[in-house]
């Protein structure tokens, strides 16, 4: 029976030395706990959202230098981790497997998960299975699963996949990610499914998680409270970005400070974050939370209090299309006579929807919203809504 340590760690962007020190502590702890395999997330050494720093040869050479140091620690334990591999001015987003002088590499396919991914990294087709501890291991990223093997999946994103039938060990990092909408903290999810049985599941929990590969089936635990996730995000931002404050003209800022019992969030600081997902001028601390979650956490008392624009913005973030927004609203209309009445007049409804959404689409998605395209959207949505009534 193989004892495994799955590590969900706070990966700090660009701070290789600090990240590797954290990895070395985990490796030493796992050895003392008698684990045969320890698995770290994707880009555990360097972080992922580094932008143009990926084109800096000196940084990539520096980040790559840590791979040999980590591999040297794989004497009594096999180590899996993710980092850049730099050779001859080529950069490979790589998963590594090391054990007693054996070093195996798997290069992530260019799938667009990272903005400008094809600009920063090179492709390389390596796909042999790895034999270790009586297991055939398929080492990869996201949900590239191979049946009839143990799939070790590395991830470092704000999206994660769910347990499924194949034998799979999935490890995601707790990493701070940020875009035009605002900061998010990836979920740090670790799970292991063995022949259809869930033998481990954890999320939003930093550290080494130990379990036996062929252990007893376990139940998925209760979700981490939303206020705790907000608290973790605030801690991560403070740790990596330094002091910040909340935009006080957003009433939600006052509620969050009160919920977290952190009045210092309302004091003046060099950086300012908003708390409304429909205000492009202030990146929102809530960009990683859905509107129902914000209601559950007590930021809003109801959908009505949150307002129609925030509802539209939330639905668009989930569906990534205006048709998707309309589809969700149609499903909600049965419990909302007001919404039902508005949808009965497609032309007026679409005009209101576009008036609220166009500024957000320009600010967050940087779409080229010409007059011709806006007219197309209006005609398309009205036509689509008309077909739903038939």
Q: Where are the regions a protein language model picked out?
A:
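Enzyme catalytic cores with a strong preference for nitrogen-chemistry domains
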Residues: 1-390
